[in-house]
């Protein structure tokens, strides 16, 4: 498998390869996380959930995703 047009990023401390045109929204869907129940930090800045489809992931980005789980 060629890594042409792929970029390395870190998600929750793990290195992964993605297409260079990937958005944050696509990444969250790929990880099978419910967009309404996550908080996402990109390079130490919290992202607006309403703009996830517009934020393109770049080489060496550091992404932290926190998934909220209900309980009591």
Language model features by range: what are they?
Residues 1-71:
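Ubiquitin-like/PB1-type beta-grasp interaction modules and other compact soluble beta-rich domains
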């Amino acid at each position: 498998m060629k890594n042409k047009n792929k970029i390395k990023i870190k998600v929750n401390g793990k290195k992964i390869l993605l297409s260079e045109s990937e958005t944050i929204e696509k990444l969250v869907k790929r990880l099978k996380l419910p967009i309404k129940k996550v908080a996402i930090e990109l390079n130490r800045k919290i992202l607006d959930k309403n703009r996830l489809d517009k934020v393109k992931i770049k080489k060496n980005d550091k992404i932290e995703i926190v998934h909220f789980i209900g309980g009591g």
